[in-house]
Amino acid sequence: MSSEADRAIQANLSSEAYDHEVDVLVVGSGGGGMTAALAAKGSGLDALIVEKSAKFGGSTALSGGGVWIPGAPSQVRAGYHIDLNGVFEYLKQITGGLVSDARLHAYVDEAPKMMDFLERSSKWMQFVWKPGYADYYPELPGGSERGSTINVPEIDLRVLGPEEQNLLAPLALAPRGIWFAPKDLRLFYQVRQNWRGKAVLLKLIWRMVRAHVFGDRMAAIGQSLMARMRLALGEHNVPMWLSAPMTELITDLDGRVVGAVVERDGKPIRIRARGGVVIASGGFDHDMTWRLEHLPELNRVQEIAGSGKDWSFGNPASMGDGIRAGEKVGAAVDLLDEAWWFPAMCWPDGRLQFMLNERMMPAQFVVNGEGKRFINEAAPYMDFAHAMIEGQRAGVETIPCWLITDIRSFHKYVVGGHLPIPKVPFAPVPTGRKVPKAWLDSGIVKEANSFEELATKIGVPPAQLRATADRFNKLAAGGHDDDFNRGDSAYDNYYGDPTLPNPNLLPLGKGPYYAFQIILGDLGTSGGLRTDEHARVLREDDTVIDGLYATGNATAAVMGRSYAGAGATIGPAMTFGYVAAKHIAHQSQEVTK
């Protein structure tokens, strides 16, 4: 049979060759996938979401729920108008040439439109902007000290009805009734500095009381965002199949992706996607073999955490299935050594804890294996983690590194989840004036009465740690960090101590002193399928694989190796999900003309 005949047969495959047909098949139920499905539906196409896990929400449900959208409608409503050309220049600078101008322009131009579409599409899609959480490089041209992180209000999960049980729960469950609105957390960290911090503590107690008395099941941040998106899907009758992993992409003889095989109830289901398939299935967060292959420095993390432990905060179901499926049909991949890095503490039970506000508190510094500071401790977490990786490659142990502080800081600031208030029996977090014995027994936290003794316990040169402490204290007393400029950026100041002239600098006082071990954690991988400005997946020669789109952590990030501001993972995921759906709709219209 001639190739022309083969193509004719392939082109005229009847619906009988498939078990199910849709215009747009979306693989993955996180923020990017749900946005793609809603945008497809809004463009007059029928969409289906298939989700590998028994739970929906993906890494978005586990996240802080912020969405980085410069020029968002909520900013405009507040009278804050951003120069989008400046935002493009900001992104171009921080991505350092790794990302095409076309992709950057697409993000900057389409992100506000995406958010406007969602707000108009459903009563559940409500977004708010509260200024103050600066971009991560606010001093750069186009950066913003007021920030562009957009959030959703809290929601009572009871409105989900039976679907509540299908929402992916946070990795660390808070006590019933405890939830933080975006600005609550910052004030909570100031519980010993001002009455606003104490007011948040009282608010949390009241929320616990309400939950027990009235049955409230309130959720905020990522949980609220994904609950709202699920409600919007229901409002528009967009179906979603849970426990339905995509196992294979289907192509025609020209290499166009025309559908996928999905396993459902133990059976393979062939689904035809008339317009296209959108891969929004997340990264390969928990495929440690694959990750170690691309970043050998993670072997050191595994040595510290334990070979059987996993240091990613990403969706437990993220194993790279969508990326591999794309590769099998010819897709190129980029940035597989990258992740949304986050310095963290790893407790003996394998539980990871963010190191965020601790790195911004004033009386502390971080040292490497030589006992020296190596970065502005308050730097954005991607920068801090890259410094750890680069130091390790250079032969200086920075995985782990150690945060050095004093007992006064422990009594004054939230450190390692410890709340600096009098001992509260049966409290859900550590309280009281003593460093928990379990911390000291774990080996993750070291205690000593002098810097020299502490140095011995963490394996750094005693004389050098003393010299580093003396140098830091001298700079802190003068009010400026001449070595690393800690405290110069509005971003540094966010979780600092607002009662100090420099919120991020204060000399360490008397002992005992403490060292907290820091390793590499992450919020998920950020490398994957190579895509263009229309979210189309590309081959190695940058030609387009027709019918295949991707967004979110399944792609090589539009942020490159950087991080523009809080929400710079979810913002692009949702935006390029929207872009993909709009492009499919446009292509479908062209075909029918």
For the regions a protein language model found, what residue spans apply to each?
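Extreme N-terminal leader/targeting segments of oxidoreductases
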Residues: 1-24, 42, 227, 559-562, ...
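Conserved N-terminal/central alpha/beta ligand/cofactor-binding core
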Residues: 2-6, 11, 52-239, 291-295, ...
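N-terminal Rossmann-like FAD-binding beta1-loop-alpha1 element of flavoenzymes
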Residues: 24-49
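An anion/pyrophosphate-binding glycine-rich loop and adjacent beta-alpha core
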Residues: 146, 153-199, 323-325, 329-460, ...
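Helical element adjacent to the flavin cofactor pocket in flavoenzyme catalytic cores
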Residues: 206-275, 323
